[in-house]
Amino acid sequence: MLLSYNADLLPRVRMLGRINYTEPWIHFSRTVNEYVLYVIRDGNMYLQEDGIRYHLKAGDFFLLEPGRCHEGYQRATCNYYYAHFTHPAMAAVADEEAAMAQLAEKRRLSLISYNLDDEDPTDPVTFLPKQFHLPKNESNATLRTALDCYNAREEHY
């Protein structure tokens, strides 16, 4: 599944944190009115959203959507980051094949364009998969830094 979003617009992050459950735990049931991004550092998270089950492991990124009920379905230890945010131009994609064709065309236009032109041949709408995996060491330092900035809560952070 893909979500489209306007990359020219920044998300509004409401909450950011890290949780480390060292004893087996199961996610509580809830429906929120914002996106929630989970990034699994270690362990496992067994989560279902609107009845669809997902098994998340270290290195997995997973995006929960607003208005959909999510809850755990199996206990596990889990160490993860989370970010609650809203975005004014983010939505589920109805036709993934058309979205991929659109991305390919944007790439083609970008490659044949003259890079010193003021005019950008593409628009800022792009796509993000609901779930993807990165080797866990690639994202941990960046996420730690983001969490440190959030926790410092300096003026205009």
Predicted regions: what they are:
Residues 51-65:
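Short acidic-glycine-tyrosine-enriched beta hairpin
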Residues 30-32, 57, 156-157:
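C-terminal/domain-terminus segments
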Residues 31-47:
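Short, conserved beta-strand element in jelly-roll/cupin
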Residues 35, 60, 81:
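Residue-level detector of short, conserved catalytic/binding motifs and their immediate flanks
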Residues 46-48, 64, 69-75:
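Short beta-strand His + acidic residue motifs that chelate non-heme Fe in jelly-roll/DSBH
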Residues 2-15, 69-155:
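A hydrophobic/aromatic-rich effector-binding and dimerization subdomain
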